[in-house]
Amino acid sequence: MSWDDAIDGVDRDTPGGRMPRAWNVAARLRAANDDISHAHVADGLPAYAELHCLSDFSFLRGASSAEQLFVRAQHCGYSALAITDECSLAGIVRGLEASRATGVRLIVGSEFALVDGTRFVLLVENAHGYPQLCGLITTARRAASKGAYRLGRAEVQAQFRDVAPGVFALWLPGAQPQAEQGAWLQQVFGERAFLAVELHREQDDVARLQVLQALAQQLGMTALASGDVHMAQRRERIVQDTLTAIRHTLPLAECGAHLFRNGERHLRTRRALGNIYPDGLLQATVELAQRCTFDISKLQYTYPRELVPQGHTPASYLRQLTEAGMRERWPDGVPKKIRDDIENELALIAELEYEAFFLTVQDVVRFARSKDILCQGRGSSANSAVCYALSITSVDPSKTRLLISRFLSKARNEPPDIDVDFEHERREEVLQYVYAKYGRERAALAATVICYRGKSAVRDVAKAFGLPPDQIALLANCYGWGNGETPMEQRIEEAGFDLANPLINKILLVTDHLRDHPRHLSQHVGGFVISDEPLSLLVPVENAAMADRTIIQWDKDDLETMKLLKVDCLALGMLTCIRKTLDLVRGHRHRDYTLATLPDEDAATYKMIQRADTVGVFQIESRAQMAMLPRLKPAEFYDLVIEVAIVRPGPIQGDMVHPYLQRRKDKSLINYPSEGVEQILGPTLGIPLFQEQVMELVIHAGYDPDEADKLRRSMAAWRRGGDMESHRLRIRALMEGKGYASSFIDQIFEQIKGFGSYGFPQSHAASFAKLVYASCWLKRHEPAAFACGLLNAQPMGFYSASQIVQDARRGSPERERVEVLPVDVLHSDWDNTLVGGRPWRSAADPGEQPAIRLGMRQVAGLSQVVAQRIVAARTQRAFADIGDLCLRAALDEKARLALAEAGALHGLVGNRNAARWVMAGVEARRPLLPGSPEERPVAFEAPRAGEEILADYRSVGLSLRQHPMALLRPQMRQRRILGLRELQGRRHGSGVHVAGLVTQRQRPATAKGTIFVTLEDEQGMINVIVWSHLALRRRRALLESRLLAVRGRWERVDGVEHLIAGDLYDLSNLLGDMQLPSRDFH
């Protein structure tokens, strides 16, 4: 079924597809404009400007994007289009981009509904009116919870009291117009108040027109036409109706009066409007539009300047801090090249007037370090020698090739992007410092637009169409599973749905339309916008879901378009882990390391990395990275930089991985067409693995640095419709002019196109590689402290607490085993801790490791407050018995049962069964009279081994007893299923039969439907590769198994071992009720 079949009365004169947002809006709209280039605005039709139009940023009301609305307005020949989302300017920047692309003038406005029912639209006339509108929206949004607003007449009057309004007000009368509402608007806005006549081909249109014209005459207001537009075209009515049902949480069949009577709330042709409205009402829209002269692209923004001490300018103070940092970073003297780079950067920063921005980031980092919060800059800012001197970044520019245009470009005329990672458990301290320093009036987080994806869209749509919950779940699973090689229709039919069913067809059509449709605003992960003046003069501010947080209504792309600077204060779990590990080493081993003082280029650490012994470390812990490590064999820091970057969609799609690995093995394959190219590509053996190398290559060929940056942006946009063809022709011409072979040029350009997929810049990879090395060094030399720190930093990373503990206890040829002790109220703190020294030794390192005592944070259902009470009471004196524990730690029933289930009372009462009994009746067992005999203790038999393991996983998420697979090993033998250690002796290519607990499932976007599954038994872990055809055939077993059996082919190549699955089946029934942690598609 097509859209035309789905709904009657469809406009067929313009394209209706949704266009995804990218930086080059003009390129995205060009195809649509070409399609409608035949449309001709006929002479004699009335001119018109639409002054009341909702985009899809009136969440769950507007059905069309700003791009779609402006394309339609251009087609219809409108002179202007106002985007008037409800109490919001969240979509206005997209309106600006679409206006630029189509030539239809944008008017900035917003719709409001007061608590007393009065409805009106405000349109910005001039630069004075814009901050007035922003302030009113901010007032309304800050007075309500996230996503809502509350506005009364008093707040409106207060906003415009004692100031000349710079806005126009359009009164939107209700079904029964109340003259008093219009009179009140006149009182506030005077002659700037207009009466909007909105007619939608309903039975009472003639009478309504007469009533409203008479009312306008009575009040002395100018009346004008208005559309109350909710969609670009009539065909989108089915979408708008569905959004209405979702908004009211009702099935469509029960929405009744909530739905519009027809599809007239679209951008109608001027001919249609001329048949509905008197000419005077249409002409009034054009006249008012002409009075709205405000251009939002001219918005002025000033960065805070209070960090500059008296007697300094921003430039002089930034230079002073940079020079002080240079002396600290290079105590033996600054290399001449670095000094020259810094001078060039400072000159460029001064020219672009970004000094205050750099000072702000430096101040935030200074605060974090003063509080011992680990932090590190990353991304393109690692190309900046100034950022390194200011201690924002940690990659020494004297040891890397800097490309400042990747970070800061005069031609780009856009703010630089500085991302700083902080410990994830302490980042809130940093955010609150920013709020405290600048005030909530001048600092807020950027927004993130949460959009529908296939699965979330089909759930809401199917519910709106009245599908039963079980069928909704089945249909949603079709969107949550699959690959590009399997058509959606096939997946849906396999799930049991009939595509010929009109209901199912409509659900799928609407779902497809709602993909990427905005659902609501959320807060950015850490992008702060800070201004010298109140932010609400620039953009509305509203409450975030979290307490003590506010967000602006624009996202990072909007900020880039509007050239507003943001400081990214991001959270990184590995920094928390490293800081906690260093604290443990300092406290228990009396070794005072910092990130900067960990021994460099440690051979033992690289040996461990080459064996892919990297569970829990940063970045190189995934199965794909582990498979790469034995092949790449990192032996120095730059190898880690490459390792971080190479297992990414960009290098994979650009066919860079295998050529690079082949050249590492066989240096005779390396060749360069010139010495200049060798200088650029030499570190990566002739393969451009990084964006900076691509930029350097084209600069070497003849681009200037700013042109090279435009190429980088084109690479990022290429897969979203960006234009690479012009670059291809020019690059070919320039490289041919240098005498490069055609095959080399073709190869380079194909690799350049690969960067259209996600890839790391070298600066970013180098920043991350610092943390890769640090985490690996700590895992190798301080395995107990690292595992303990990792557990205390959870949740984070790829691996569950169970896998982390299993890995620590198992050890490896390169690192010591670690003993792990159970949770015990007599010994455990809230956090996991290090205790004593253990005699485990390995041939690689005869040093002694402490044991890990599991903390009460591992106990499900136990709060930190309760754990702290237990520790405080225990510190005063040891617990005599269970009653003493419960009394002095004030344990409620929930805490008592949680501790009993976790086996944490072993030291007081013995086994789990006894603990459950005692804790269940602890309040009931009290003497009736003084001197009454005590109840005799009941002897309880300890639970069986399997029951203990089951209880461990249920209450602690891990078990220190036998591995569940050890208990099942006799049954595995009967089924001729091998233990994972037995695979080590198998030949490459031999058939094997194994089974293990599923601990991970991954489906990389570049793997064409292939699923990677990690299995674990008592002997270790293996990676299983499940090709897409088998994944589809054994979908249920693959996705739902806790214990998965695999028949397949064992492969061992270049030190990489994995199992290619030939068949799968589920053995979860052998585990009973045991629920095991698995990190799926993480």
Curated annotation (Swiss-Prot):
Catalytic activity: DNA(n) + a 2'-deoxyribonucleoside 5'-triphosphate = DNA(n+1) + diphosphate
Biological process, per Gene Ontology: DNA repair; DNA replication
Enzyme class: transferase
Its biological purpose: DNA polymerase involved in damage-induced mutagenesis and translesion synthesis (TLS). It is not the major replicative DNA polymerase.
Any GO MF annotation of the entry: DNA-directed DNA polymerase activity
Designated gene of the protein: dnaE2
Protein family per UniProt: Belongs to the DNA polymerase type-C family. DnaE2 subfamily.
GO cellular component, one term: cytoplasm
Protein name per UniProt: Error-prone DNA polymerase
Record's subcellular location: Cytoplasm
PANTHER family membership: DNA POLYMERASE III SUBUNIT ALPHA (PTHR32294), ERROR-PRONE DNA POLYMERASE (PTHR32294:SF4)
EC number in record: 2.7.7.7
InterPro entries: DNA_pol3_alpha_NTPase_dom, DNA_pol3_finger, DnaE2, DnaE2/DnaE/PolC, DNAPol_HHH, NA-bd_OB_tRNA, PHP_dom, Pol/His_phosphatase_N
Tree of life domain: Bacteria
